[in-house]
């Protein structure tokens, strides 16, 4: 049996705007329950919505970043369904005329770049949040602080063919939205949520069949998403072998994911679009966007996106794929690197220092690069001391620790503590001769082919110079003297 896994993703991104989508309530995470509500987001009679202009601007910017076609007419619809956390009895969304459609992004996979097509991006408001307490209390609470929060939903084509590709796609989307400062995209806080649609395209005797689509919900991490897709692939394959159920006969159903057991669990048959009874929202007029306005959003707000940055960093600085992927995980980290590399003769070594020493400090302190106390110029200056041979790598690490404590440049510490590397060959030769005279047994061991004797003598040279001697020069002179013994 030949088959191909088909995965489509519906991603909800809560935008980091100051106010909600259709009212003036503050758009923040957390806080006292029901403290950021008004008659509009609570759906009280007579309250009328008004469109947050920044919601539309954000959608346009997202459309540009995903190579989408952007509509000139914005229409909002009412999506009707009954649920306790939906106070109006409908959600303001977009049905048949999403603001963006026919887009695409590229993802990075183990076999290279892959194009993932995007069906649509539409604007909508979030619902409230239901809080289910212990069964013994026999009650639930609703927090409407989130009701009306501005959302973009990004729907992909089923172009994703593995759990690994799904995670790569989500990573790419999250990076794009973070680079554009549209959202913090925190799965933990619910500002980046994803529903996964999975089925199989099976080929038997040149006849194609599609298995029923499983929409998997309640996925709270990229790890869970990958596990759910991998499990659903094996489950649908087995079910096809046993029951040969097709999409035409069953349609679509909703599944949950049990994190503890690592399996998907059937929840319900999926409603059709008609169940939502979409109508145009009579309280929100059509909004016309001319081409000049749409392009102005791009020219004023678009930044270099992560994939483009990675390609440029490789070409401009000769960095490895690992380096550029790590650096571009945070646009502020890229900025820090480029400011340091700008004045350095060895950008690759600057990258190594940032990805090892600087990131280690950030992780230990649990801070971002924005809170790091050393400016990029200090890292560049320290690297230049290493490149020029004025300090060794070992001494540089000690200098770096002192820089962290005192917030001063490496030059100040080097001058104060007389740490500049000794590169005077005449002086080094005198130290080497002194070590040879003091260690005749090591010379004999060297003559017998014992390599550890060289390491011992180099250690003695370093000890006598407090680690300041140029190790390459010292090793060269030592080997020359040993050959003459």
UniProtKB/Swiss-Prot annotation:
Positions in coiled-coil regions: none
InterPro entries: Asn/Gln-tRNA_amidoTrfase_suB/E (IPR017959), Asn/Gln-tRNA_Trfase_suB/E_cat (IPR006075), Asn/Gln_amidotransferase (IPR018027), Asn/Gln_tRNA_amidoTrase-B-like (IPR003789), GatB (IPR004413), GatB_Yqey_C_2 (IPR023168), Gln-tRNA_amidoTrfase_suB_CS (IPR017958), Gln_synth/guanido_kin_cat_dom (IPR014746)
A GO BP entry: translation
Intrachain disulfide bonds: none
Record keyword ATP-binding present: yes
GO terms for MF: asparaginyl-tRNA synthase (glutamine-hydrolyzing) activity; ATP binding; glutaminyl-tRNA synthase (glutamine-hydrolyzing) activity
EC assignment: 6.3.5.-
Source organism superkingdom: Bacteria
Pfam families: GatB_N, GatB_Yqey
Catalytic activity: L-glutamyl-tRNA(Gln) + L-glutamine + ATP + H2O = L-glutaminyl-tRNA(Gln) + L-glutamate + ADP + phosphate + H(+); L-aspartyl-tRNA(Asn) + L-glutamine + ATP + H2O = L-asparaginyl-tRNA(Asn) + L-glutamate + ADP + phosphate + 2 H(+)
PROSITE patterns in alphabetical order: GATB
This protein's UniProt keywords: ATP-binding, Ligase, Nucleotide-binding, Protein biosynthesis
UniProt xrefs under PANTHER family: GLUTAMYL-TRNA GLN AMIDOTRANSFERASE SUBUNIT B MITOCHONDRIAL AND PROKARYOTIC PET112-RELATED, GLUTAMYL-TRNA(GLN) AMIDOTRANSFERASE SUBUNIT B, MITOCHONDRIAL
Similarity comment text for this entry: Belongs to the GatB/GatE family. GatB subfamily.
Alphabetical list of NCBIfam families matching this protein: gatB, PRK05477.1-2, PRK05477.1-4
Assembly description: Heterotrimer of A, B and C subunits.
Function (record text): Allows the formation of correctly charged Asn-tRNA(Asn) or Gln-tRNA(Gln) through the transamidation of misacylated Asp-tRNA(Asn) or Glu-tRNA(Gln) in organisms which lack either or both of asparaginyl-tRNA or glutaminyl-tRNA synthetases. The reaction takes place in the presence of glutamine and ATP through an activated phospho-Asp-tRNA(Asn) or phospho-Glu-tRNA(Gln).
Protein name, entry field: Aspartyl/glutamyl-tRNA(Asn/Gln) amidotransferase subunit B
Organism of this sequence: Borrelia hermsii (strain HS1 / DAH)
Gene: gatB
């Amino acid at each position: 049996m030949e088959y191909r896994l088909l995965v489509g993703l519906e991603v909800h991104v809560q935008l980091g705007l100051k106010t909600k989508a259709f009212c003036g309530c503050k758009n923040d995470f957390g806080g006292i329950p029901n403290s950021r509500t008004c008659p509009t987001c609570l759906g009280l009679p007579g309250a009328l919505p008004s469109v947050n202009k920044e919601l539309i601007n954000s959608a346009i910017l997202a459309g540009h970043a995903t190579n989408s076609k952007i509509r000139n007419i914005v229409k909002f619809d009412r999506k009707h369904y009954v649920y306790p956390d939906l106070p109006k009895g409908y959600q303001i969304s977009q049905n048949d005329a999403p603001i963006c459609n026919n887009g695409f992004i590229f993802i990075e996979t183990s076999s290279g770049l892959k194009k993932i097509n995007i069906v649509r991006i539409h604007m909508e408001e979030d619902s409230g949040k239901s809080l289910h307490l212990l069964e013994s209390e026999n009650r639930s609470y609703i927090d409407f602080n989130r009701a009306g929060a501005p959302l973009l939903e990004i729907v992909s084509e089923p172009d994703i063919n593995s759990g690994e590709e799904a995670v790569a796609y989500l990573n790419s989307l999250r990076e794009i939205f973070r680079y554009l400062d549209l959202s913090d995209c925190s799965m933990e806080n619910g500002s980046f949520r994803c529903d996964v649609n999975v089925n199989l395209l099976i080929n038997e005797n040149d006849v194609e069949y599609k298995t029923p689509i499983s929409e998997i919900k309640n996925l709270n991490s990229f790890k869970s998403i990958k596990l759910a897709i991998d499990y659903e692939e094996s489950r649908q394959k087995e079910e096809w072998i046993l029951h040969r159920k097709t999409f035409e006969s069953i349609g679509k159903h909703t599944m949950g994911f049990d994190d503890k057991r690592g399996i998907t669990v059937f929840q319900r048959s999926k409603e059709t679009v008609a169940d939502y009874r979409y109508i145009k929202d009579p309280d929100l007029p059509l909004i016309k966007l001319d081409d000049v306005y749409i392009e102005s959003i791009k020219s004023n707000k678009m930044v270099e996106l992560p994939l483009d940055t990675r390609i440029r960093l490789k070409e401009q600085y000769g960095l490895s794929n690992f380096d550029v992927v790590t650096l571009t995980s945070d646009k502020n980290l890229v900025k820090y690197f480029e400011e340091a590399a700008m004045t350095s003769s060895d950008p690759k070594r600057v990258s190594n220092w940032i990805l090892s020493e600087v990131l280690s400090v950030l992780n230990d302190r649990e801070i971002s690069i924005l809170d790091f106390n050393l400016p990029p110029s200090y890292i560049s200056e320290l690297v230049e001391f290493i490149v020029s041979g004025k300090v060794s790598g070992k001494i540089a690490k000690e200098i770096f620790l002192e820089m962290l404590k005192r917030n001063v440049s490496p030059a100040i510490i080097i001058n104060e503590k007389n740490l500049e590397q000794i590169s005077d060959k005449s002086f080094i030769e005198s130290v080497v001769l002194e070590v040879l005279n003091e260690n005749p047994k090591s010379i004999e061991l060297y003559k017998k082919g014992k390599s550890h004797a060289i390491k011992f003598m180099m250690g003695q040279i370093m000890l006598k110079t407090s680690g300041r001697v140029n190790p390459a020069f010292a090793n060269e002179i030592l080997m020359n003297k040993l050959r003459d013994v």
